[in-house]
């Protein structure tokens, strides 16, 4: 189980994620002794927390592997959940970033993503634009996926 604890607006909140089986994960939010549950019926490859939308409350950022309405091939996606009055609510259930998502990390409350381009890999920063994630800038490019993971300083999963 991965857990993060933050004090937000004088209330303690804690997002956790736990695997139930190979395709079911429980995302939980504990706020002042109460717990909210959101079931994710997809494999999870990454979990992080950050104040993505800048509202002063920590959000859960979950990488899932699934198909979407517009992209029917299963692939890696980014879902963002918020704390709404002590309940887990979707903030953004992304179907795609700019390119094919390989992995992501959180840097300065932004999503830093490795994406596959035609002949290389691109590391880009994405920030909240009021509706979803918008690319701020490309911060690194390489023909080597390992170089991109090293740049992100995360373990390949």
Placement of each model-derived feature along the sequence:
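Beta-propeller-forming repeat regions
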Residues: 10-157
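Bacterial N-terminal signal peptides
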Residues: 1-5
